Amino acid sequence: MASVPKPPKGHFNLLYFAGATSFTHKDYEPLPAPLSLAKLFAELEARYTGIRAAVLDTSLVTINLDYVDVPADGSGHDVVIQEGDEVAIIPPVSSG
């Protein structure tokens, strides 16, 4: 992944890795902040139909390099992404 520019004012950067990059055909994209983690997942499902089941349900998430818990029930309203944050979607990687 190349260097990611700062997000525009009022936004955060969402970084995609591995299967998330393949699914979205993007390395990153800026999204409006603030946004709860639950709303982020809903927004991604609206933009990329099927991403929740194919990628998000088995991925790890970081905010500013700190791992955050992603509840299995899809909640996550208490985790709020702020302007300028860097969020990463990290799917499992298999080795062989």
Model-identified regions with their sequence ranges:
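Ubiquitin-like/PB1-type beta-grasp interaction modules and other compact soluble beta-rich domains
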Residues: 1-95
